[in-house]
């Protein structure tokens, strides 16, 4: 692996808006950034590069802040919060739905003691059926009660609810959501696409997709799903009934290979603003600041 020579992150105080400004650096993708001032945590995905904390400099409110640590994610050490969003609509087909539950159950068996799981289901209704658990038995017990028998798919509302819950949670070293769905929203008037896009624009949580290739969803709906994932700085994966476990393993490898970067601003003053923006090499990432 080659070492990163220059990695500059710029944090700018904003009123909840992202700004497209480039900074210097190499091929690094920022997936998550959060703050509980004076502490800041950043998740960084690299293209086969090493990151050392000496390589990382942050500019916070006009002041230079050096990283105190930059480590590869370690489930035995770093805290992780994961939201699983599971589509209960009949359009998912039983085989795809069963594969999704098996993926989540396998994750629970191997997640480590520092991971907290939330499970949100959506069909004609949206429900948080698991409100933060580290108990694999509890997670699998809840999964066993679920079936894909609902008409309608409140896809947008489920994503918004996950981000709303995230906003109330303490900062974690890593946080992301995984949506198991074919990606179509049949329910209008509850939460709109624009509302979700606006929420993503003010959120720091990446959304990853496990899209079921059922063949029932239009190219337009798949495009909407893909754009929401990209806007959140997540990534879309597509699975069939034959390869769901392998595809989900790839997603887990992607998230587990990230660097966890910590920095300390030296004070907890942020002028009463609840949102910060992270500007870096190629794309903006929101930094959620907890007062």
Q: How would you name each of these model-derived features?
A:
Residues 56, 87, 100, 119-122, ...:
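DG-centered beta-turn motif at the end of beta-strands
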Residues 8-16:
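Bacterial N-terminal signal peptides
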Residues 280-291:
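Single conserved hydrophobic/aromatic residue that forms the stacking wall/gate
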Residues 181-231, 248-251:
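VWA/integrin I-like adhesion module and closely mimicked acidic/polar interface patches used
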Residues 23, 28-83, 88-97:
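Acidic, polar low-complexity linker/tail segments
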Residues 220-221, 228-276:
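C-terminal helix of von Willebrand factor
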Residues 75-131, 137-180, 211-221, 246-247:
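Von Willebrand factor
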